[in-house]
Amino acid sequence: MLDVAVAYSRYQFLGEEFLTWLWFVIEKNQNFIKSFDPDFVALEVGNRVVLENRKKDAAERITIKGDGASLEEGILALKKGSLITELNIVYKSAELRWQFTLKGESLNISTLSIPSTGSAESEEDIEGVVLEKIFLYDKALQLIEKLYAHFTKLRVSDTWHSSESPLIRKWIQSS
């Protein structure tokens, strides 16, 4: 049986490849996301991207943050072999908007901001407000779970090497 720490470090590349693939999907192919959420409007790179290049003797870390920050430095880092370790995502569905950061090494979600809900005007309304908040949290989590499940199936298929990986490389080189 694998030690948890060994397994964690051995497979963290999957989460980082997932985030890199997700950025590619955000830039080039958002239409297929509608199959996971019929009300899907958009998925955008938010206000923070962290990339890391571990191919040299020392790890190089690049952080791009701020509203309206240019992502060209991130593309340049991808060209040099970096992988995304954190990605802030803006998810829009119907008239609703979520924003959160996804960490590659563990796929932890942090700073999840959900759409605002109605306030409870009486004690009877509290249960409805709580259930609405649970639904809104779950909707963002379900999207990430479905995207990751799709990614893992794609990653172990022949399509990854024959089609998807070359498309990602082409996107990185042409940006």
Where are these regions (language model features)?
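Intrinsically disordered, low-complexity, charge-rich terminal extensions
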Residues: 1-175
